[in-house]
Amino acid sequence: FEKKISSYQDSKYGIGVGNCTDAITISLKALGVTSDSEVITTSNTAVPTVTGIVNAGASVRFVDVNEYSLIDVNKIEKAINKKTKAIIPVHLYGQMCEMDKIMELASKYNLKVIEDCAQSHGATYKGKKAGSIGDVGCFSFYPTKIFGAYGDGGFITTNNLELYDKIRRIRFLGMEKKKMSSGHWNGKYYAIEHGTNSRLDNLQASFGNIMIKKIKLWNKRQLNIANYYSK
């Protein structure tokens, strides 16, 4: 299931977690965000975005939205200070933020970018899928989302192998398997850093394997409905 979702979102790696709130928290921790850090996000978002930041120990700095109800990139730079460590653009209702400008700011100020993709499965920005542009993308599989499972579920995408390994450890109590000198796995797990217990359960993954076959149809139907209202 992880391979299917990451492939669909045009990302090299994918990690299933308990929910999107955990996905944001784990991603921030993996990216080095600490208690003395500030994270910029939009004020027009659901509580879980902010909860994910606070759970990582960081402070939130809100930026207002543009005419499309997405984070105003022209106001992000004014909010950046010496404590700023990351930006969380929130893609809403299948519409993506101006990611090229956000990535330019991130590069200029050496900031991390965590895409909140809870409402944008399959969305694209200039030919690039949601969750494939920033350092990580965080998704929700809650039943009311564009792509819902049977219950709670979350997902993290990234194109960075080192970051993938760290996220995978953090979501499983900081543990990983060790290899013996022969190169074979010794079957034991070692806790090498602090982590949490936030794995995507098999039921949600199994349900997701079925539902992913329908996501293109759902997105097409929603676009047709949106076009109808636009008229």
PLM segments and residue spans:
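Solvent-exposed alpha-helix faces
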Residues: 3, 10, 44, 172, ...
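Active-site region of PLP-dependent enzymes
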Residues: 120-126, 133-231
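Active-site phosphate/pyrophosphate- and oxyanion-stabilizing loops and adjacent acidic/basic residues
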Residues: 3, 100-103, 152
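Alpha-helix termination/capping residues and helix-transition junctions
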Residues: 8, 33, 81, 130-131, ...
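PLP-dependent aminotransferase-like
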Residues: 29-117, 124
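Phosphate-binding glycine-rich loop
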Residues: 1-38, 52-55, 62, 128
